[in-house]
Amino acid sequence: MEYLAHISDDKTRKQTVLEHSQNVAMLAKQYADVFEAGSWGYCCGETHDIGKYSDEFQERLKGGKLVDHATASAKELIARGGMYSLAAYITAGHHAGLPDKGTDADDAGRGTLCGREKKKIPNYQAYKDEIKIPELERPKRMIGKNAFSMAFFLRMIYSCVVDADFLDTENFMQEGKTNRQPGIITEELWDKLTSYISSWLACKDEDTVNGHRTQILKSCIKMGAEKPGVYTLTVPTGGGKTVSSLAFALQHACVHKKRRIIYIIPYTSIIEQNAKVFREILGENIVLENHSNVKYEEGDELNPMQLAAENWDKPVVVTTNVQFFESLFSNKSSRCRKLHNIADSILIFDEAQMIP
């Protein structure tokens, strides 16, 4: 029997569970490799949909009743024990959101991981004919012994898996014809910036406003070549902080091969001003402005920036404190999709004193 994961809207095309699982596994591994946890992305991606290996789910694709297909993977991973029990959180929540653990007293009706483990679900054992649960490697980076570190690590893997799942499903349903235009920092962006600031750097004044602005800019460029760490920039109003901070970030990204720059700013008015400058320097398609005031033209298809707002896969992202921190601590797939793209990025907190 052929087990399907998706059927196109016009009913003419099919994607098997095996094909979808392998696609998600490879993409999730690619994302998790950035923070040296590729085996976790691969394992969770490969197993997340094994619950679709049931007759009931196959009937669901033909219009049948709803079927829980996410619990199956969690059951299999929990049965393996050890690190796999942690991976179970990710596959259990790839649609409904990361669950709480709960307690052994929870019954099957509870949405906790302990409750889900007791839930009766359709027989899915046919998965064993096509999918083998991959090996999990211990994370190479120290996670820490506290619960917060472990929870955040799992949230990052969750982000890799749900984004890969969304993207592969989207790619199948739209036959690869999406409007996505992902990108990372390149030397070309540095060239655009140096062209923009060439007149600033040519300034020979020392005691004028322009002269001080030039010195601040040069200092930022110099510091951009230093090793990764935590840096502060204090500049008076009119000192060119917006361009100077971008110069630091682009220099740092090019020297240390960082993937993107994320600006986190408290006020939308400041975001709009900064994003306008960044677009003027780098180009319209490079800068994602992500906050509640952004309006998009309505149409049959989402434009590239609307799509990028789902997972922050643009070279430069400008967003609010609220958007950033709510995403960091969310358990919902829609908010967590973007988290893996924070890894190996440069974070700039503007007006950092405004953080509560």
Model regions: which residues?
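The Walker A (P-loop) glycine that initiates the GxxxxGKT/S ATP-binding motif of P-loop NTPases
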Residues: V235, S292, E351
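SF2 helicase catalytic motif II
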Residues: N321-F325, R335-P356
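Conserved Walker A/P-loop ATP-binding site and its immediately adjacent core
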Residues: S244, A249-L250, K257-I281, V294
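Inter-Walker segment of RecA-like/P-loop motor cores
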Residues: L282-F329
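Short basic/glycine-enriched coil/helix segment immediately N-terminal to the Walker B
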Residues: A225, E310-K314, S333-S345
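Conserved pre-motif I regulatory segment
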Residues: V17-H20, I197-T234
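Walker A/P-loop
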Residues: K227-A249
